[in-house]
Amino acid sequence: MWGARRSSVSSSWNAASLLQLLLAALLAAGARASGEYCHGWLDAQGVWRIGFQCPERFDGGDATICCGSCALRYCCSSAEARLDQGGCDNDRQQGAGEPGRADKDGPDGSAVPIYVPFLIVGSVFVAFIILGSLVAACCCRCLRPKQDPQQSRAPGGNRLMETIPMIPSASTSRGSSSRQSSTAASSSSSANSGARAPPTRSQTNCCLPEGTMNNVYVNMPTNFSVLNCQQATQIVPHQGQYLHPPYVGYTVQHDSVPMTAVPPFMDGLQPGYRQIQSPFPHTNSEQKMYPAVTV
C-alpha cells in the first residue's frame, strides 16, 4: 500500500518537472517570437525591403522593438527609439502585397499586440497547472485505503441483545419437559405443605400473563425491566427450562415398566403426572427427598 503511494507520488513529481521543462521551452520560444514585426518598406533608392520579425537572427534576445525610421528599420530594445509604423507611407508595395504577409492597409494588416504571445503562454501554463492538480487529486483518491463499513456502525445496536438472557433451543426444552415427571413427587410435597405467596412485581417493569407467577418451575430473569410487555411475553421461558441440577441425570422409563401404587401424598398432583421409579436402587428403605424448587 505504502509502496504504491510512494510510486504515485514520485510519478506525480516527475510529471510536474516535465511540465516545468516544457513551459520553460514554451516561454523561451514565446519570448523569442514576442517581438514586433517591422513591415516591409521602400528605401531611398526605391528598392523594396522585406519585413522581418524582431529580434532578428543576429540581434540580442531583448531586441524586440522595431526602431529606426520609415526608410531604415531595425530591431532594438529601447522603447524611446520605437518607430511608429502607422505614420509611414512607404511600407506598401506597389501592385502585389508583400509575400507571406498581409498588406498593412488591409483588414489583416494591423500589427500583432505585444501582450498576445505572453497571454497565450500564460494561459497554457495555467492550464497545465490545473490539469496536474486534477491528476494528482485523482491518484491520491484512488490509492487511499478504503474504510471498513462495519467499523462505522454504532455499537449501540447490540446493547439490547446483551441484556436478554440466553434462551435454550427447542431441543433443550423438549428434553427438559420429558424430565419434569421425575421431580413431581418432591415438588408436590412442598406445594401441598404450604404454598408461598408469589413475589409481587410492579406492573411498570413487565406485564406477564396470568398464572405465570404462580408457577414454581419458572425462574424469572432479572433483565425484563428494559423490555416492554410484548417482548416479555415472547421471552417467557418454558416450565422445564429451569430445573434443579440434581435431576438432570434421571431418565424416563418406558411404558413396559410396571407401575406402582400412587402414594397418598400424590393425590393433589396436576393431571398428566405419574410416579416413575428411579433406575438407581436405594440403600435405605426411606425414600430420598430432594429440596423443592423455589422462585
UniProtKB/Swiss-Prot annotation:
This is Protein shisa-2 homolog. It is found in: Endoplasmic reticulum membrane. It comes from the Eukaryota. Keywords: Developmental protein, Endoplasmic reticulum, Membrane, Signal, Transmembrane, Transmembrane helix. Its main location: endoplasmic reticulum. Residues 132-295 are cytoplasmic. The lineage of its organism: Eukaryota, Metazoa, Chordata, Craniata, Vertebrata. Residues 1-33 form the signal peptide. Belongs to the shisa family. The keyword Transmembrane applies.
